[in-house]
A protein has these predicted regions:
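Short beta-strand element of the alpha/beta-hydrolase
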Residues: 91-100
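Short amphipathic alpha-helix adjacent to the substrate-entry channel of hydrolases
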Residues: 109-127, 263
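N-terminal cap/lid segment of alpha/beta-hydrolase-fold proteins
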Residues: 27-89
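Active-site glycine-rich loops that stabilize anionic/oxyanionic intermediates
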Residues: 99-104, 249-250
Length: 311
């Protein structure tokens, strides 16, 4: 698969994660007034490198056919939203969560805030990363006109990504890990117990961080869920972090890239864990779709293996 075709394939995941996902049974989203008042940390001390002259305005909107879910577009200022247990962290592990959205938007609820809320309720501090995404029309009605035929939506989504979209997102992920580690004492977790968890395109961000050439740029543990790097998998570092991978067998988008990553990790002696669910399609995250409903509990069991759920 060429890098360009991989880009187009991953970009089409936007429709599945952010548009068609609304037709599946979902758990209630985290109330807007809850996450809107949580602490927010800047990822970069100044303008994000490469975006110094970008004047786009970030936009949050409801996807078609959903009055409760949110997607975020035109992110140019990466941030971390903090979810911390009200009675303090019961575990010294922190989780960095990277939502998906084809590098064009962020499915911020079902692949971000809802996941962070789950970890918070289980005694862990979690951070939801808004990383930079490719430009989309500034007006919501131009991005997703109410009566636009699905074929036209697909045509828009499958347009080639800008060449800097993926590198910018990965750079934001690496810098976000630094910010999470810098805030370990403040929020009560260990800087060497950081799990990076990402979905779809966010799984690509996580994979980019776990394979970073500089060990200091990597998370301690990584969980790319139905996502991996676009194009060829780079050389696997000998000391790459332990990895938990998962996707659904009926997901037509990411099987080759996830299996390629799994095999590369295994060949490098990483001993990755892979879960392939019979049902779930692409973008199952916190929705109810079948056997994939249990991925989060299985991730928790994997974390127990490494002592990450302990105080």
């Amino acid at each position: 698969m060429t890098y360009r075709n991989a880009n187009r394939m991953m970009a089409s995941a936007v429709l599945l994660t952010s548009l068609s996902a609304m037709s599946h049974a979902q758990k209630p989203p985290v109330p807007e007034q809850d996450w809107a008042t949580r602490p927010v940390l800047r990822v970069w001390p100044g303008p994000a490198p490469g975006s110094e002259t970008d004047t786009r305005k970030e936009s949050t909107m409801h996807p078609p056919d959903s009055a409760t879910m949110h997607i975020v577009r035109n992110v140019t200022v990466p941030t971390l939203t903090v979810f911390q247990p009200k009675d303090g962290s019961r575990s010294k592990t922190a989780v960095l969560i990277c939502p998906g959205g084809g590098f064009r938007l962020l499915a911020i609820d079902q692949e971000g805030y809802e996941v962070a809320d789950w970890f918070e309720q289980h005694g862990m501090t979690a951070f939801v990363l808004k990383y930079r995404v490719a430009e989309t029309p500034p007006k919501d009605e131009d991005f997703s006109p109410p009566n636009m035929p699905m074929q036209e939506q697909i045509k828009r989504i499958l347009a080639p990504l800008p060449p800097d979209a993926v590198p910018h997102a990965i750079a934001d992920g690496i810098q976000a890990l630094k910010v999470v580690r810098e805030n370990a004492a403040k929020y009560g977790y260990s800087p060497d117990r950081i799990l990076a968890l990402g979905f779809s395109a966010g799984g690509g961000v996580v994979t980019g961080t776990m394979l970073a050439p500089n060990p200091a740029d990597r998370p301690n543990y990584a969980a790319p869920i139905y996502g991996a790097l676009l194009g060829p998998t780079p050389e696997i570092p000998k000391d790459a972090p332990p990895a938990f991978l998962a996707f659904a067998e009926d997901d037509p988008l990411v099987q080759p890239m996830v299996l390629r990553l799994f095999n590369a990790l295994r060949d490098a002696g990483n001993k990755p864990e892979l879960h392939v669910y019979r049902t779930g399609q692409h973008g199952f995250s916190m929705t109810e779709r079948g056997t994939s409903d249990h991925w989060l509990q299985e991730l928790w069991w994997w974390m127990e293996l490494f002592g990450l759920t302990n105080p």
